[in-house]
């Protein structure tokens, strides 16, 4: 039985991994947290007390899996502060678009990280 989504993992070279860490901490608002001492380099980023995004360094000769580009669209985070995030994205020159789903009472912001992964922020506050 599936109980819920645990985390996403994004894998990249070391330089891109550092840039992704900075983006998800400074723009999305995740925080850097504890990560077990794995043999590989990486980070665990947290929303509150839950690790939700893992960043891992690609090993030297690891080939990119071609199907990944064709299947991944976006990750979604529950968020508060629609105006705060809209301003933050504008201030950082990050293109985004806004959407509403009145039937379920949500407002959404969609944008991309520095390597093109889609991000959705879902707001349910009135």
Question: For each predicted feature, which ranges?
Answer:
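Mid-chain, well-packed structural core segment of small domains
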Residues: 68-89
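Short acidic/glycine-enriched loop/turn segments that link adjacent beta-strands
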Residues: 38-42, 71, 103-107
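Conserved active-site tyrosine of GNAT-family acetyltransferases
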Residues: 20-27, 89, 116
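Conserved acetyl-CoA-binding loop of GNAT-fold acetyltransferases
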Residues: 25-33, 94-95
